[in-house]
Amino acid sequence: MSSFLGRLRRKKDKEQNGHTATSSDGAYQNGNAHRDSLVNDHICIPAQRNSLTVAQQSADIGSGSDHEGIIVKQKPQLAFSLDRLLIDSSALSYFIQYLDSTDKLNLIKFWMHVEGFKSSFSEQIQAAQELSLRDAKSIYDKYIDDGSTSSLALPRKIKQIVDDKLSASPLQKSCFDEAQDFVKSLFEYRYFDEFQNSVYYKKHELEVLSDGCSLADILKVQPLLLSFLEFIKEKEDHDTIQFLLGCDSFEANLDLMEDSEALGDAMALYEKYFSMQATNMIDLGSAIRAEMESLICEESGRPNRKAFRTAKTACFFRLHDKYLSDFLKTSYYHNYLGELQSFIDFTVELPRKVRNRAASSSDVASSTDSLTHAFSRHLEVLEKKMNDKDESTQTPTGSPSSSKRSTPRTPRSSRLAEVDEMGRYHALYDDSHSQTPQKPMRIKSTLRKYLDKNTLREEEIAEEVARTIIRDMQEMVASSAESPTSPTFRYG
């Protein structure tokens, strides 16, 4: 695993702050090749330059910040897509930590071992082919075989395909492709989304954004995007950001739309931002407008994926050159870094799940005893508080309430509720959360108080009669207990 990460780091260093283009950020990365063509009309895009180091201004950052400087980047730095994550050694290390915490480390280990197998595979050299065959057997025994502790539990159909490919001669480089595609689908549809919501992705964000940031990163991070919109004052530049976001959404969903729907969305973007009657005009010149028109209205009836590519590149670099350097100096940006740090510091990382599903009975018993002990301690504290309250409200000896409260309580005899001398139920805990909230009927209560006095009087008399009867019964029982002989009742 370490050798694979090392190769990724060396590859990243050679690319000099770049990465392989993906569908989500390829337009931004490939935009440099079109800067020379963007001098049409009055559009002036400065020549490509190296990354800029933005000196931090202490007045903007606020006290306590330890970020000495943020580098302006032209290419995305954060791993927004799974494809970028799998080739970014730094982001991949956090993804590995996340999978380890969810007891799914075997998935990423299989992926990395297969990538290493492919990179070292050779059909020309006999010794290398024998080594590849040995590696393939090792991968199969560890991850494909159902009896292995690290088995991926592949679907039967995929496992059969892998078996057939490994049985064929000569061995092919693509023998694990179906299994690798299955694992990648698990990453894409489950674990990558969960990773982006975890503390491990926040650590990746903090590490990357503390070193450098691009406009593409800001457009992907919602808190930074909102701060960037607040930082920008000119309305046309607000429209430019909205166009970039709308264009990203259009390109991401283009393959899922019918021709007519795709054409309608493309025309909506064009008419809102670039047509002569645009409501939110972004003036990029007539040449770029004509290019968009020709790529949107093609003979096939479906807009070209590159219809907004030139306009998107021009808008991107306009915002990049005009605002990014100053924005990275502001408290907006550094406050977000502080929020990331606070989130990480105050997040409790739960221990990794137990890998052995069949836990021993002793472990279960130990856990149960611990829980019982903790619950008993809680009852003792609760009982002590209740006894203290009873002592403070205790009436003189001999009264009915005194005899009622004189029974000592232990944790095992603690009650969650009691019934008073009137037969009414009283909870000894706060049960307000379990009761259905009712709106106070203040008018009804007031009317009842002043207009229904007879009913209230009858209720008071009934309660007093009940108290008298109960008191007489208690005195009768007490006197019979003190007499030497009990009365004999005869029937008939």
UniProtKB/Swiss-Prot annotation:
Keywords carried by this UniProt record: Repeat, Signal transduction inhibitor
Domain RGS: 81-205, 214-337
Parts forming coiled coils: none
GO cellular component: mitochondrion; plasma membrane
Residue ranges, compositional bias (Low complexity): 393-414
GO biological process, one term: negative regulation of signal transduction
Any Pfam family hit: RGS
Region (Disordered): 1-32, 384-418
Compositionally biased spans, kind Polar residues: 18-32
SMART domains attached to this UniProt entry: RGS (SM00315)
Protein name from the UniProt record: Regulator of G-protein signaling rgs-5
Protein's organism: Caenorhabditis elegans
Lineage: Eukaryota, Metazoa, Ecdysozoa, Nematoda, Chromadorea
